[in-house]
């Protein structure tokens, strides 16, 4: 998929029975993080969906790890903007395959991925037919304020990427 001139990597799993004569519904899977990464390998949840006839596209939108520091920092202090554009563009990418039913594309994710589900449904309501938010963050201000002091390095990393709740309240609400 690509958005705003940037190629966005991902992993696409095709159900065995999907074909141009029998197009499959599809889900865009957004990993947790932010800064996480979807990788090739076994995932019970994804395998379950594919076994039940869903195409699953695991997007590594801008801000994902594993593609260099520049790519990783492209969404710093801008979550729900271009990263959301990446996710919406992946729907168009999926609809381009004749073995995918372009009228039945949803979005699924947990943690940061769940936040992206909520953002897609709120800010791009026509993009997806369904959204599945698995324990997604819907209140970044509360989440960032609740990080315990013994998670200092992780807290600092999240503040750099998402914002400091003491100084970036307007953007985080």
Mark where each language-model region is.
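Serine-hydrolase catalytic-loop signature spanning alpha/beta hydrolases and amidase-signature enzymes
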Residues: 32-36, 56
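N-terminal cap/lid segment of alpha/beta-hydrolase-fold proteins
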Residues: 1-21
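Short beta-strand element of the alpha/beta-hydrolase
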Residues: 14, 21-32
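Short amphipathic alpha-helix adjacent to the substrate-entry channel of hydrolases
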Residues: 40-60, 72
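Short beta-strand segments enriched for Tyr within beta-sheet-rich domains
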Residues: 24, 54, 128-129
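Glycine/threonine-rich flexible loop motifs
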Residues: 35-41, 66
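Active-site-proximal cap/loop segments of hydrolase catalytic domains
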Residues: 61-173
């Amino acid at each position: 998929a690509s958005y705003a001139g940037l190629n966005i990597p991902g992993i696409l799993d095709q159900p065995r029975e999907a074909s141009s004569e029998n197009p499959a519904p599809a889900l865009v899977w957004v990993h947790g993080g932010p800064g996480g990464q979807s990788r090739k390998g076994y995932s019970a949840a994804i395998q379950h969906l594919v076994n039940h006839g869903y195409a699953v596209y695991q997007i590594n939108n801008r801000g994902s790890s594993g593609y260099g520091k520049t790519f990783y920092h492209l969404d710093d202090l801008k979550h729900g903007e271009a990263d959301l554009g990446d996710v919406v563009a992946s729907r168009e990418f999926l609809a381009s395959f004749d073995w995918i039913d372009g009228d039945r594309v949803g979005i699924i994710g947990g943690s940061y991925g769940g936040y992206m589900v909520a953002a897609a449904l709120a800010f791009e309501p026509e993009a997806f037919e369904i959204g599945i938010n698995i324990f997604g963050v819907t209140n970044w201000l509360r989440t960032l304020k609740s990080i315990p002091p013994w998670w200092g390095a992780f807290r600092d990393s999240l503040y750099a990427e998402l914002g400091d709740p003491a100084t970036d309240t307007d953007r985080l609400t």
